[in-house]
Amino acid sequence: MSADLAMGPELPTSPLALEYVNDFDLMKFEVKKEAMAAHDRANIRQCNRLQPQGSVSSTPISTPCSSVPSSPSFSPTEQKNHLEELYWMPSGAYPQQIDPQTLSLTPEDAVEALIGATAHGHPPPPHVQQQLQAGAFDGYRGAHHHHGHAQQQQQQQPQHHHHQHQYGAIPHHPDDLSGHPGAHGHHPHHHHHHHHSQDPDSPSPTSPEQLHHRHHHHHHPHGHPGQQGHHGVGGGLNVEDRFSDDQLVTMSVRELNRHLRGFTKDEVIRLKQKRRTLKNRGYAQSCRFKRVQQKHLLENEKTQLINQVEQLKQEINRLARERDAYKLKCEKLTGANGFREAGSTSDNPSSPEFFM
């Protein structure tokens, strides 16, 4: 774009406005013109035809000619010399203001993309400029869609606190610059952790799928213990062989359910049936033991009672023999007197027969 267009009769006399317009004079910047010179001149002529007469904006406001939003225009009908209108370029939300449908590449687009490089006094080589011109603004299409997602991932991983979102399409990591030949040593002040702000359409060799795989690679060992046990079962270890009979019987239901996470439903049902069988067997053995113990107690008591009965029988026999002895002795004593009166002595309380 020529300098005559930037200097019009309606240019305001404010020094700040003049400095603002002169900062965007495109004649100061070097743009590669071998392959795209004719295309750039055609776009410039088309943009000049669409430029309104009352505007002195350095960038055309027609969106098919440029994907960069137009700067605040200075027309005599609207005198808005607010400072916030002049500071639209350094704002962090610059990539979000771009129309995602405009894909035309103009010298203005290339200059705006290379502002970050020329600001440090290290202009890139011409072939790097061509690569940046070809792929830089393709990433601007989804920049405002992925800006919130990058901020959310930045909050989730606070170790990437060096994240900066200046230009989503310009790679700042030294690994990302490996895809561009001759680009090492470029941007020494922007080698930050830029893993999570890469756009899906960015020409960087590090794709979001690789970043996603790299992110999940660190969290892979934190799987569920039941799932690891399930992989162990597939390695030849049966679910019934993982626990002994004593462990199944003594283990609580909550602990058993925690160990059975990751197994199939059939294996869980089979193991619980085995546990129920073992518990029933334990209950039966306990009842049998109690019955045997009670039987032993009863048998011991019976033996004691039998012994007591034998002792009582022996006592009865002894008393019977003693009785017979006393009876014979009494008969001998009565027979020695020589007379016996029938029934006379039986009624006498003093006779021995009275007690028999």
UniProtKB/Swiss-Prot annotation:
Residues 270-295 are annotated as: Basic motif. It comes from the Eukaryota. The keyword Nucleotide-binding does not apply. Residues 183-196, 212-223 have a biased composition (Basic residues). One of its GO terms (biological process) is rhombomere 6 development. One of its GO terms (molecular function) is DNA-binding transcription factor activity, RNA polymerase II-specific. InterPro entries: bZIP, bZIP_Maf, bZIP_sf, Maf_TF_N, TF_DNA-bd_sf, Transcription_factor_Maf_fam. Residues 49-79, 140-240 are annotated as: Disordered. Pfam families: bZIP_Maf, Maf_N. Homodimer or heterodimer with other bHLH-Zip transcription factors. Binds DNA as a homodimer or a heterodimer. May act as a transcriptional activator or repressor. Involved in neurogenesis. Involved in the development of rhombomeres (r) 5 and 6 segments from their common precursor 'proto-segment' in the hindbrain. This is Transcription factor MafB. It comes from Danio rerio.
